[in-house]
């Protein structure tokens, strides 16, 4: 028996939020699609069906570990394209799986393959246990008997020659490959599905999926707290850069880079949470290449380092301490810029300001200080 796995990820759905197709969004430190591919590692050859515009992304993410196939205008066309790519091979069994189901247990896949020894098709499903209603105009119009009803899952498995012929003969518009198979007269066995095998569709599904992954690893949540502090003195100039935003002022800030005191404090907070020292360790002020450098370079490095270590940024809080300039009118733009660099939602970033009540060097308007706090959450 030679197995091929077809992972269908050609959709453009953004119901899960953030404007990015869900298969490319991060899940526990890796894109959803990478997690899905990993679930079938070692089983056989893997074909990943992508939207034509995403072929470059697929190559960057998966390289030569899989065969990339350009999808069609419908799911059925996408699957057929992958099946056609297998014609002439030695494949005898094919598993067709949703790219947005990254948590399929190996036991489910094994059950599907075992069933194919006695039937031309097999698919996992869970019996419907909730009460079912029929609705009309927002009102309950009746109830539906749930006896014999199932929630379909994937991978849906078939003997290769039969499902290829079925797709070639199907007129199109099928909800899934079981419908295509049944249209061709093929019997499809139901094998037990699994609650972990959820299809990521909406934003809350990501939190549920990450919880399942943590439970599988036997890990409690790894939460780290980092603090950062920075100070820069005023010098001659007509503006300051705070949290990536140019703010008009009667003075500038003195520093080896662009002296963005808020971004420096936040960057140090991330490094601190990772036990990675401070900016000076990674970007020494003695190195002339960083003279006048934009501070987003430092923050971007820290955020990517956190991600590479398996952490996501839970939230960031930056406090700027100065008498002038006024930060309030620019705070929203500052938070948005920090969020953009760290690739997190703006709602997870806070920028605010306070004074030292005319005390100390900030009270004497000799410079600006900043304190930042960040939480890192392990995947």
Curated annotation (Swiss-Prot):
KW Lyase (keyword) present: yes
Residues bound to 4-CDP-2-C-methyl-D-erythritol 2-phosphate: 230-232, 256-257, 278-280, 354-357, 361, 364
Keyword Nucleotidyltransferase (UniProt): yes
Region (2-C-methyl-D-erythritol 2,4-cyclodiphosphate synthase): 224-379
Pathway entry: Isoprenoid biosynthesis; isopentenyl diphosphate biosynthesis via DXP pathway; isopentenyl diphosphate from 1-deoxy-D-xylulose 5-phosphate: step 2/6; Isoprenoid biosynthesis; isopentenyl diphosphate biosynthesis via DXP pathway; isopentenyl diphosphate from 1-deoxy-D-xylulose 5-phosphate: step 4/6
Residues binding a divalent metal cation: 230, 232, 264
Site (Positions MEP for the nucleophilic attack): 146, 199
Chemical reaction(s) catalysed: 2-C-methyl-D-erythritol 4-phosphate + CTP + H(+) = 4-CDP-2-C-methyl-D-erythritol + diphosphate; 4-CDP-2-C-methyl-D-erythritol 2-phosphate = 2-C-methyl-D-erythritol 2,4-cyclic diphosphate + CMP
A GO molecular-function descriptor: metal ion binding
Cited PROSITE patterns: ISPD (PS01295), ISPF (PS01350)
EC number: 2.7.7.60, 4.6.1.12
Record-linked CDD domains: CDP-ME_synthetase, MECDP_synthase
Family annotation (InterPro entries): IspD, IspD/F, IspD/TarI, ISPD_synthase_CS, MECDP_synthase, MECDP_synthase_CS, MECDP_synthase_sf, Nucleotide-diphossugar_trans
Site (Transition state stabilizer): residue numbering on this chain: 15, 22, 256, 355
PANTHER family with a match to the protein in the record: 2-C-METHYL-D-ERYTHRITOL 2,4-CYCLODIPHOSPHATE SYNTHASE, CHLOROPLASTIC (PTHR43181:SF1)
NCBIfam families, alphabetized: ispD (TIGR00453), ispF (TIGR00151), PRK09382.1 (NF006899)
Record's function text: Bifunctional enzyme that catalyzes the formation of 4-diphosphocytidyl-2-C-methyl-D-erythritol from CTP and 2-C-methyl-D-erythritol 4-phosphate (MEP) (IspD), and catalyzes the conversion of 4-diphosphocytidyl-2-C-methyl-D-erythritol 2-phosphate (CDP-ME2P) to 2-C-methyl-D-erythritol 2,4-cyclodiphosphate (ME-CPP) with a corresponding release of cytidine 5-monophosphate (CMP) (IspF).
Full protein name: Bifunctional enzyme IspD/IspF
Originating organism: Rhodobacter capsulatus (strain ATCC BAA-309 / NBRC 16581 / SB1003)
